[in-house]
């Protein structure tokens, strides 16, 4: 019987999302339940377990005598909690070892789904789940019933734990431990898939035997292999409960020679087995998880797809695709339990898929019931598919893929209209990563913005794109001498970075360059071709992918057949998998309710109007006479909306013709309903409005529009001159690389440059638009157009002239000769206005002046090849950061950082100036000899004759000086001089002789270039003495070198190391190097040390007590260490009534330092707090709460799970910070008005652990009693652990508040004063126990704390009975001070 995962998965947080009706129970219902509970208590229950043997007594209810999971109420710590009585086969080994020894009572194992704990419970303290005992641990009985709705949670949890235990063993194996056949990642993926499909303990025993067969025998204990191995195999094949599996797993773990395995793993250059395994092991274990929060909702394919099931995927880091199998295959998986049978499961499963949709199979399906019999088989229908594995081959050989399924993605057709789901996961499957896309789908769609093209991608293309096996590793070597870890390219032995660049074929420019389609072109295509192409479905003249009936019917067809004929009901669907008519009344346009209002009728969020205007929709709706016509209008609007959303997407690379064919196909599926007619009406009505609002022009006939009125009309020119690939080209516009700022004339050259030079995939963020007249850079066309209109109005004038698609001569294909300095100019005979007279012969760019053309030719066409190897840099521009985002950024697909190329952006002005000088010189010598070139015309609008003559004189003077100036050295010149130099004096001397005056300390740049090339130099360091006796010539005008100040030197000034001067005023104070820790707030003067260490050796760092004003005061000094007892651990008060037991798990890490990928504490935290973020907003999935410097990065409001003494790691583990004690240097001092306080003696960085708040742990009753006893003084050492601090309380229902009193027992945290702007933040830290009162309260720096600054925290506001009671004035003196402190 098929059981849905959604009905069997426990969701702890579901009651929070279902509404307030689950949280509060009405009073009449409570009274009725109370009467019912008392009646049921008499009739159902009775004396339980009174015999001394512990056997079932005759009076024991029948519902407790069966050995099966049963939901019941358990009295735990005075309150009734919902739990599951486990079957004996599901009792864990650790629980059995802790069984109570009291023989007079009868006990059973209870599983609490809320805390995932097993515990023994007295049978006298249980009640039937149908009763309503009181008091309960929840807000209502309904919440407790929802927790135990899934009776299989206990078995699934223990089976998941056992499976993870096997995965942990595999994590410790190097590659030499396993056999040769088992060193392929596909083998381990199949092993993991078989383990996740285990339905019984017998299957887990077989998996243990299979795991043993993959390990080499020399790493196993020979005595165990000889004596105990046959019996162990027999026990594995006969395993029937969790206890036997845990014992067999422990025995298998003990027989491995871990010392030899560890020696292999510690050897250098020995890679650990399956590095990919560690990235998705936790995700495999999550398929057994009892939480449903991370599962994405995927639309169910149709009845004749390859898998007739819901696709489940993880949001965080899904690596596998989970598919639901049919019920008819469950018998195969249960009956065939031998090792040979397990390997044949998949072939049997896929071979039986051919007849799953037959009428006989449909009759055999039974409704799902929440019974233990149905729940125990919930994994019988799970199949995990790995891309490229043998399962895909089995699918192909069995002929499951239908020919008619190979043209369009069917998952799009199954999206119900008006579903109203706003948080659906994208259903695109990424073949290269072997997982589903983790982004959220667009509102009203099933794809995200990145995978919109998947709607039009055929299945045959997807199958061809995914290789059967993974590519081999690259054979290249990195610059560090290690082996490259990338995959090699198909057909090569190296990756893209290490492939040989000689003889490589350039990529095809025609297919790599994609431009944005015009709306006008789409409009015209739909208008002219729709009447002819919209044919009834099934006719031979239709497109090939229209022949997919009957399985290819859209959800609109299903809606058209099953929609309610009542005009006042909504047409939306209440289900994602099939069309279920909505029962709500239609309140919007007589078709939709509030929940199912389509996206194209909602308010636009991009600052523009809707794609489908509300007025047009209302006009068309008024013309509909029947409900069928309204449904057809709805379908047409949905097709129109999705088409233009995909067309306007910048990331959609699907050709426009394919998208239009898809729209025509969708409209032709129901030709009788008139969907095509409504679509044509939409096209005719919306064409003019979309053309006007979205910034597109219909052609060159609109070019006479005023530029000042419609700036976006300039885009019309970009689509008229499109002879070659540069369709987005203006005469004044060029392209530049956003990484290195190299200039390019064509976009395709920029794409090749980014891919070959920077080894990254080209994206829009890699491209900058460049203004050719002035060289400025811009992020988008709007900014460039505004700049050109304001700064270069003559360039805008050319946009009003009729565009010329073809240049006069056809010599553009000629290639310039290398090193040629001749400038070829082609005059435009048709241009009579004097604008853009000079045209470049090689690229077609037009220029007003001949020098502009000369500089362009010198910069772009003087290299040996247009797309050759690395040539000289094109120079830096001066408006580098004028981009849309304001800074250089990179797309998410980039795998390399910008650090490797950041140094190239600096110090490039010299190279650019050299190139400009060469161009000016060539223009001066050859400008007068050029034949056939007319001089530039004067523009009387801007300059008069006097100004023009004056400018010519100034330009002649500047040109003469520029020609006499020497060139600046480039990187090659500096590097060549540094290679042959003996010291920095030699470097500067050789460069000055060749290039003249140089910038100061150019030897540092030379040393940096040598370091990048692997040349080791020492002469750049201070104090280096040349072996050849070179002595530097000291310039008296140079400033003294900078010398860092000494620590705590408040008034010291850095002077020259070679001179000893006592005149401090002769040296400018700007020579001092001031750092952050020099600005100390700690007063320096006569400070009296009262105590050298207030902890008296209990802390690893001594903490002194000082009094700054003791010498100026006549009062006797106080001794604050005498009024309390210094302790390093909190004391549990008897009022808590809590046994200090160990409820914290130990991690399975075997090394001295844990890894966040394999540590169980990180895994447990990820399950409890899936939405946790760090202080930068990033997810905390598979990350420690501390960084590499043991500073906390976890956001406030979440607890910290640290490793404990039971773990195998040492105290140097990254996940051990609080338990290591105080490390910062602190001191207790007397404040002006707040008594004693605590301040820093050194600079404390943000996130550093300062101290722990320690004292006596009390309940609220005892805390209130002590407050009354202490009185209403100005000093209180009681810290309330309420909902604002108790982070663990979010996991527990009705968690009681408690307090920590540091009055008589405490540490230095009792001296921390209050501030409304504190510099500390508190976290609950779990170390020894998961109980909230046993957690530690850690105080961490929330900002950088300077030396001498007081350490403060926020006491918060505690509710008081009256406003005048227990309120004290606040002395923090912060800008946001609240004034009063309660």
From Swiss-Prot:
SUPFAM superfamilies: SET domain. InterPro entries: Post-SET_dom (IPR003616), Pre-SET_dom (IPR007728), SET_dom (IPR001214), SET_dom_sf (IPR046341), SUVR5_Znf-C2H2_3rpt (IPR040689), Znf_C2H2_type (IPR013087). Keywords: Chromatin regulator, Chromosome, DNA-binding, Metal-binding, Methyltransferase, Nucleus, Repeat, S-adenosyl-L-methionine, Transferase, Zinc, Zinc-finger. Zn(2+) 2 binds at residues 1147, 1182, 1203, 1207. S-adenosyl-L-methionine binds at residues 1234-1236, 1277, 1313-1314, 1355. Zn(2+) 1 binds at residues 1147, 1149, 1154, 1159. It is found in: Nucleus; Chromosome. Residues 919-928 have a biased composition (Polar residues). Residues 1224-1356 form the SET domain. In the pre-SET domain, Cys residues bind 3 zinc ions that are arranged in a triangular cluster; some of these Cys residues contribute to the binding of two zinc ions within the cluster. Histone methyltransferase that functions together with its binding partner LDL1/SWP1 as one of the regulators of flower timing in Arabidopsis. Mediates H3K9me2 deposition and regulates gene expression in a DNA methylation-independent manner. Binds DNA through its zinc fingers and represses the expression of a subset of stimulus response genes. May represent a novel mechanism for plants to regulate their chromatin and transcriptional state, which may allow for the adaptability and modulation necessary to rapidly respond to environment or developmental cues. PANTHER family: HISTONE-LYSINE N-METHYLTRANSFERASE SUVR5. This is Histone-lysine N-methyltransferase SUVR5. It comes from Arabidopsis thaliana.
